[in-house]
Design a protein with these regions (language model features):
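A short, N-terminal "cap"/entry segment at the start of jelly-roll beta-barrel domains
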Residues: 1-35
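Short acidic-glycine-tyrosine-enriched beta hairpin
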Residues: 73-88
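Histidine-centered metal-chelating micro-motifs
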Residues: 47-49, 68, 84, 88-93
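Glycine- and acidic-residue-biased ligand/ion/polar-headgroup-sensing regions
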Residues: 55-57, 61-67
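Conserved short histidine dyad/triad with adjacent acidic residue
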Residues: 24, 38-53
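Structural motif
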Residues: 66-68, 75, 91, 101
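Ligand-binding loop in jelly-roll beta-barrel domains
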Residues: 88-112
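Short, surface-exposed secondary-structure edge patches
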Residues: 39, 59, 73-77
């Protein structure tokens, strides 16, 4: 059993852009095949370059604001309440071209 209180978690930079901050609730190794379970804040103008994961699915649940995801070359504007699943090997990027913060909870699942 594990309980994590948000206010006790240190903010760290995400792996694709250290300026974008996240709080990791569950890190790799605690649950089999779970890469992480985290909360991220994208400030206006922040972005992550196009990348892909060879052996991981990612799921994002938008909690506030709006963001732009480009997945396989297609642009999607997402907002509060939307859920996005990105499969392994799908090139994707995220950005916040809007005027308010975008926040989301996300996790990665390793495929074996």
């Amino acid at each position: 059993m594990k309980i994590v209180h948000t206010n006790t978690i240190e903010e760290v930079g995400i792996s694709h852009n250290e300026d974008i901050k996240k709080k990791v609730f569950i890190d790799k190794g605690y649950i089999p095949q779970l890469m992480n379970f985290s909360f991220a804040t994208f400030k206006p103008g922040q972005f992550v370059e196009t990348h892909l994961h060879k052996t991981m699915y990612e799921v994002f649940y938008i909690q506030s604001g709006k963001a732009e995801f480009i997945i396989n070359g297609e642009k999607y504007i997402v907002q509060k309440g939307d859920c996005i699943t990105i499969e392994a090997m799908e090139p994707h990027s995220q950005s916040n071209p809007f005027k308010e913060n975008a926040t989301w909870i996300y996790f990665g699942i390793i495929i074996v």
